[in-house]
């Protein structure tokens, strides 16, 4: 990890994160810079450019990204994010979104448009299917009882956040999305599903499942599950899970390997 604090201070320090590549290649990629002179750097056909994805109609700049596999498009979540620090719980840190939506960035036209922005839903973690014709994402129903003190209420009710996995069809020619379809209903079992990842052959959905929230890397109860999208059967991957957190998983380009953070 680059120790940038060795050559900077609290005024000009930076966090560089959320690297994302197009279809396992290296010509097109993006990463975010936080703090001083922050923004998103997009490398398009080998040319790097810094962009500001925040508009008057979005919550924030782009956060969690997913490149379209063939087109110059990136789906992002936009998030108003905070942290809570617990003294009694064994999970000492919780990362929480008070609001979140899904947007689409058209690189060639430098245009941002909303994909899903429902006031009572916390939409996050978009991910394209390998054929580029479906966008998967997570969303949790959350209705504030106090319309003013959102941050305080989220800290009090953070265990109420239960994400399901959804998808929308996508027309690559017209760049339009279809209706939202439920793929995996975690909330019915009072659980939360995050980080949908589709295998390169398009058959399997890999995701993390935990008790609540969207930041399962901090949650010891989070495990990796897989759904066969042909018959919609879901099972826990017993041989790769432990009694600690499993999350932030990815497929290899040939679909024969899975990498998991534990």
State what each model feature region is.
Residues 28-32, 73-77, 134-138, 203-208, ...:
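Residue position within the beta-strands of beta-propeller blades
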Residues 2-14, 43-61, 103-122, 169-194, ...:
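Multi-bladed beta-propeller domains
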Residues 76-97, 138-161, 208-220:
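Short, conserved, GDST-rich strand-edge loop motifs in beta-rich repeat architectures
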Residues 20-22, 66, 127, 197, ...:
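Conserved beta-strand position repeated across blades of beta-propeller domains
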Residues 190-229, 239-262:
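Loop/turn-rich, solvent-exposed surfaces of beta-rich toroidal or solenoidal domains
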Residues 23-25, 69-70, 130-131, 200-201, ...:
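Residue-level detector of Asp-centered blade-edge/turn motifs that repeat once per structural unit
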């Amino acid at each position: 990890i680059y120790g940038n604090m060795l050559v900077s201070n609290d005024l000009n320090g930076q966090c560089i994160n959320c690297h994302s590549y197009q279809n396992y290649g290296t010509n097109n990629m993006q990463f975010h810079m936080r703090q001083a002179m922050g923004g998103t750097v997009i490398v398009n056909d080998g040319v790097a450019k810094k962009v500001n994805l925040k508009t008057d109609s979005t919550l924030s700049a782009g956060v969690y990204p997913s490149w379209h596999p063939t087109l110059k498009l990136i789906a992002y979540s936009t998030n108003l994010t905070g942290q809570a620090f617990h003294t009694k719980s064994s999970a000492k840190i919780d990362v929480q979104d008070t609001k979140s939506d899904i947007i689409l960035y058209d690189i060639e036209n430098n245009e941002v448009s909303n994909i899903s922005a429902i006031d009572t839903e916390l939409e996050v973690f978009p991910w394209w299917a390998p054929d580029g014709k479906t966008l998967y994402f997570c969303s949790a129903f959350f209705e504030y009882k106090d319309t003013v003190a959102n941050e305080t209420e989220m800290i009090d009710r953070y265990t109420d956040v239960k994400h399901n996995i959804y998808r929308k069809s996508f027309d690559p020619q017209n760049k339009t999305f279809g209706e939202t379809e439920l793929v995996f209903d975690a909330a019915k079992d009072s659980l939360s599903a995050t980080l949908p990842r589709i295998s390169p052959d398009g058959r399997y959905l890999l995701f993390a499942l935990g008790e609540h929230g969207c930041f399962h890397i901090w949650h010891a109860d989070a495990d990796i599950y897989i759904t066969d999208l042909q018959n919609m059967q879901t099972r826990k991957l017993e041989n790769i899970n432990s009694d600690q957190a499993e999350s932030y998983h990815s497929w290899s380009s040939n679909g024969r390997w899975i990498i998991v953070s534990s």
